[in-house]
């Protein structure tokens, strides 16, 4: 019974908190970009017209776009207390990043797009029963698994990343993401779409007898989202005077990060070409952080420290952001020297295909 609870902790982005408090949310993303509050503090259940007898604490935001959900998420990691540099990346439709150590912290945020959560393509769906969640390609053959082991209804974010990564490794698409119809019979021109598509589930494989496919346009839209995520990371590293190699550990938050294949995410160029041991995935860091604070009030000191010491940057105001994004609209990147492991895999798969055709 919530009415008997003494305290509730809420962590959310600045816009959602404004909605909950019935404040003007337009102030968050309209000039002069000054939210009504970034630190609501405590409210009673009665003030919010909730059937709750205790106090409700809202975790404060760092800026308009780096909200209390990110501050809460940082409670689940500890790089802001260490000498080594760490990086926290909450990635979904929006991307929020924090980089630093015990001496300095820099945050940034921007729109990534819906592709990483499956919300592109005619057959892109959220993670649910019947969603294709993993894809493997061997030569011309494609294999997949679905959530719940059901016949496929569509493909979710983790499946899309696998699909694009595997197509790149096996020559179904080139570095620009252009489909290659000579690579497999599953890559074909579809009259009703007016373009080439990659069929990942034939009609006899799907739940309703409809072939499921990813179009050339879908790939382009995906690369826009992927490029935004990569460019935000790239710009934040430059703002901090760091390279990807300088980061001792990457903390990845969000459903996509918890369920997606890290190697595929590196292959398509979302994340830098690093050893998997340098990455930790956290499913719901905002919820975990709120729980941590609820069970240990001493962590309020961390909340105060983070909101006072994190410097926020604006990616959109960086003069070369658009140029960097264009360079990132490749698989994995226009500069393959930054992705030696991916290049090695591409070469190995190509050699395997050539041996099988001799």
Spell out what each predicted region is.
Residues 2-13, 164, 245-254:
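Short glycine-rich phosphate-binding loop at a beta-alpha junction
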Residues 14-27, 242, 254-274, 315-324, ...:
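Short glycine/threonine-rich loop-to-helix capping motif typified by GTGT followed
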Residues 27-45, 72-75, 80-159, 261-283:
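Glycine-rich phosphate-binding loop of actin/hexokinase-like ATP-binding domains
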Residues 48, 60-77, 223-227, 279-316:
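Glycine-rich phosphate-binding/hydrolytic loop that grips phosphoryl groups
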Residues 161-225:
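Gly/charged contiguous loops adjacent to phosphate- or pyrophosphate-bearing nucleotide/cofactor binding elements
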């Amino acid at each position: 019974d919530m009415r008997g609870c003494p305290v509730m902790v809420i962590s959310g982005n600045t816009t959602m908190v404004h909605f909950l408090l019935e404040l003007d949310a337009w102030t968050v993303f309209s000039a002069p970009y000054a939210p009504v509050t970034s630190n609501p503090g405590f409210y009673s259940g009665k003030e919010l017209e909730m059937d709750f007898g205790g106090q409700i604490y809202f975790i404060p935001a760092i800026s308009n776009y780096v909200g209390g959900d990110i501050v809460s998420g940082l409670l689940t990691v500890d790089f802001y207390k260490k000498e080594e540099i760490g990086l926290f990346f909450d990635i979904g439709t929006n991307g929020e990043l924090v980089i630093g150590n015990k001496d300095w912290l820099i945050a940034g945020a921007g729109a990534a797009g819906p592709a990483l959560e499956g919300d592109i393509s005619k057959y892109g769906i959220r993670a649910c029963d019947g969603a294709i969640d993993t894809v493997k390609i061997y030569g011309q053959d494609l294999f997949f698994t679905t959530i719940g082991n059901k016949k496929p209804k569509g493909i979710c974010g983790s499946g899309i990343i696998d699909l694009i990564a595997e197509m790149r490794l096996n020559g179904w698409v080139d570095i620009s993401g252009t489909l290659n119809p000579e690579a497999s019979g599953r890559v074909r021109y579809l009259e009703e779409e007016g373009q080439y598509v990659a069929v990942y589930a034939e009609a006899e494989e799907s739940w309703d007898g409809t072939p499921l496919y990813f179009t050339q346009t879908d790939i382009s839209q995906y690369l826009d989202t992927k490029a935004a995520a990569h460019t935000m990371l790239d710009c934040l590293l430059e703002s901090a005077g760091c390279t990807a190699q300088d980061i001792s550990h990457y903390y990845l938050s969000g459903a996509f990060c918890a369920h997606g294949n890290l190697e595929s995410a590196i292959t398509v160029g979302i994340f830098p070409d690093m050893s998997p041991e340098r990455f930790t995935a956290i499913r719901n860091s905002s919820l975990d952080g709120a729980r941590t604070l609820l069970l240990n009030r001493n962590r309020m000191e961390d909340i105060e420290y983070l909101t006072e010491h994190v410097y926020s940057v604006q990616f959109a105001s960086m003069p070369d952001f658009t140029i960097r994004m264009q360079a990132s609209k490749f698989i994995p990147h226009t500069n393959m020297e930054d992705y030696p492991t991916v290049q090695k895999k591409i070469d190995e798969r190509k050699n395997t295909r050539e041996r099988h055709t001799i």
